[in-house]
Amino acid sequence: MPWRKTCDPYKILVSEMMLQQTQVERVMPFYKDFLREFPTACALAAGSLADVLKAWNGLGYNRRAKYLHEAVKRLSSMPNVMLSPSHGNKIAYEDLRRLPGVGEYTAKAMRVFAWDEPEVLIETNIRAAFIHHFFPHTLDVHDRAILAYAKEAARAQDPREWHWALMDYGAHLKKTLLNPSRKSAHYAKQSKFEGS
């Protein structure tokens, strides 16, 4: 996965926005094409919304493209904030949460994958791993129950490597077993993609 080969905050933000509600295999070609069109945060901020939507076309959930464009423009206008790999300033969780289209998970994922900050992430594959091991006979497992285990397990781990390993393991479980995430109180079956 190309976003695992970078710590560039801009490229991490692009990947996290694209991966919302969309599977990795579907995102990969769009991610590469989008970054060819908009290789830097400055290029995206300077681009028109029409060009951004054109580059996003076919991925679906086009509101994410609009939010990404708005978020990067907003970040570009903030003093002491730059989305570039050479700029050492980390963006605070609270500032990330104020951006359009950036929820709790995306803000924490940005901090983990761009700056190796010790946040604790819960997403579908991580949820599957914890449910499989700690709640094998429980239905309607809430994320707050998983969070206690996730916080303890994440201690003294490299944040990036730990979360990537959990994501990969959870994805493996979902392919080889009945999806453990179905026991989550947050589970909702997605309909098949039919264009956008």
Indicate residue ranges for each PLM-predicted region:
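Catalytic cores of DNA base-excision repair glycosylases
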Residues: 1-195
